[in-house]
Amino acid sequence: MAEAADTPGMTPSPARRWLRRAGALLAGAPLLAGLLQLSAPAAQAAGPASAKEASDTGTVAVAVDSLSPGALTDGDTLTVSGTVTNNGKQAVTGAHVNLRVGSALTTRSAIDGVAKHPDALTGDDGSEVGGKYAATFAKLTPGVAEHFSISVPVGKLDLGDDGVYPLGVAVSGETAAQQWDQVLGVQRTFLPWQPEEADTPTRTTLLWPLVSTVHMTAETGSDAQQTPVFLNDDLAKELAPGGRLEQMLSLGRELDVTWVIDPDLLASVDAMTGSYRIRGDGDTTTAGTHQAIAKQWLGDLQDAVLGKEVVALPFADPDLASLAHNGTGVAGSLSQLKEATDVAATTVETVLHVTPSTDFAWPVDGAVDPSIVKVATSAGADKVIARGDSLTETGDLTYTPSAARPIGGGTTAVVADARLSTAFEGDLTKASASTLAVQEFLAQSLALNQQTGKQRSVVVAPQRMPTAVQARAMAQAVTLLQGGTWSQPQQLAAAAKAKPDPGATTKVPSKSAYPSSLRKQELPRSAFEQIAYTQDRLDNFKVILANEARVVTPFGRAMNREMSTSWRGRNTAANTFRQSVQAYLDTLTGQVKLIDKSETKLSGRSATIPVTVQNNLVQGVDHLILRLTSTNPTRLEISDDAWAEQRVTVSGGHTSTVKFTTSANVNGQTRVIAQLYTEDGQKYGNEVAFDVRVTEITATVMLVIGGGVLLLVLAGFRMYTQRKRAAARGAEETEEAEGSEEDGENGEDGADGAPEAAEPADGPEQATDPESRPERDSGAPPGAASAQQPSDGTPDTAVESADPSGTGERVDR
């Protein structure tokens, strides 16, 4: 409603001020109508209706950029600073900014109501502090922001009992169209008032998450150190001064909080401290250069967590809800969660040198249903961090119960307070928004404490990845809370062990109660099917490797990252990452392969077929079986069977050729298939098929062979006949010699002359006869051999010798 300015230096009662303003309106409206010659509707607009319109819109925006101290105690001076901006078309004259304190808000829902409409002019903002505790402006020009700052001693605020008081920062003034003092804009916030220590302070646990998106790929270098490859350089930006993770660390180390850490983040930063590469376009990579930033951040974190409680999430912070709703029906999905949990503690211990707790599971936004709880506890966790807007109170409790409560099966639900946990989720880039968030957080915390005198444990679980400005607002609020008078810090483990309230809800909501907005962001079933396919391919690949850890470790962690909660709302990026992991694994497995063969020709009944295995990996492979199969074993056999196998071992960067013995039964073409197998009978890689053409025994070959045999037979027959003729001539010559001796002739001369006349005809042919050489060498007496000339026909005379035939000698009969 429109309000007139109070008399300077006086603080009249609200009722009196309202009556005075109403009277002025009723008396002045007709006068204004007459003076301005307005129509009846216009005159009504200048009256109460005009005031309602102003209350709905507010022509001047008020921004409270700072409020100090956030939690008041006796003797403090409240300082409120900010800006007022005239968003109207007319200048505002006689403007002044005042503080208004309303009645104490006794319930948390009452605080919600004020926070829901912080700038509505229709609210009851209580009495105006007035007096000199105001900021005045002669004129507010349209579109121009004016700064103000008001300081008021706490004693002037007339605060009563302990509690939460609404504080309205209102600007009043008049315009040319409405020439009376009225409220033109307001901004409401909260003043927590607890000057003395609370009788029963609330034990508050604040989770401080160090979680990021996926940064590392499955790729590593071929060097001994296996240089890692990052998706981009975004992690360096988060670690650099002013970056999100740098702010989370520098702010959190000054607070008493429970560090909740994704081990994948630690592994990624640790990898950045050494040599690393950044993926570029295509298959290119560039060298990373932010080792110093990574080392600084990691060293600071190691110092910050000393003596503090550290909770390790499963590696890469897997999406438990997606797994429960879409992944349990895919073989191996729960095994991935178990592996991510098992490696978490080792990673944290190795990098931070502290022993973390791994028995807490944290579903997205603390939303649970029976399937999520079942999956969350399947890997060993027995405590589930839920949130109050999921595990809602259905009983008759008039206060917020402690966080811990049993939900069956030996599982404890640690229910974070929904209001406190979501206080910093909005856009806090403006200082005014951040200030309002801090004050609302403190107000809700104090109101919670004042609900009952019972000792309670409260958990605050903020969003997983606060922005830098959200982190600063969180840190400011926690600093004020831990320095206040109604709360004490407590570790998460202690909160989980606190005695549950008997009336607190222990029933996990049904699956249908799971928020649809969260369900839309889940990883689909196809994502888990692809992960399972990748795992199957990896299992088939690792068994052949001499050093499987070089491949199993980076791909195992990459598959953990494929299930990360950080993919929510980023379906395209998630799918691209999964595809890249699969493609890189296919590239590696393809480095061990059979070299293609062209058609092979076999000439003869049997031959060997070589098949070459190539290994382009940097490490050796073994436990491989090469099988060569004939598709037509009746025509072509492999080692006397349809197929044969041989074990294969190939060093890194080398090839190995395996030879198979084949035998051909029929001429023609046969298809042969070479295939690698693992020792357990699984196919490895693609088969290589090639044709084998057999040209064993053709008609032409048979004709040639037959002709050769015939020639040998004819040659032997001729030799036989020649020897018979030579023997007959020798007998005749002997008889003639004997007759000559009886007649008194010189037998020696006659005997020598007759053979010399016959020798030219027989000697050369016998010398060239192949049969003559073995007979001479093996059967002639030593003395006779030395007395003969190369052209002499000694075999013919030796055949007639009475001595036994020599070994291997053919003897004519």
Question: Which residues are covered by each model-predicted region?
Answer:
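Secretory targeting and sorting signals
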Residues: 1-45, 706-720
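Asparagine-centered strand-capping/turn motif at beta-strand->loop junctions
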Residues: 83-91, 612-619
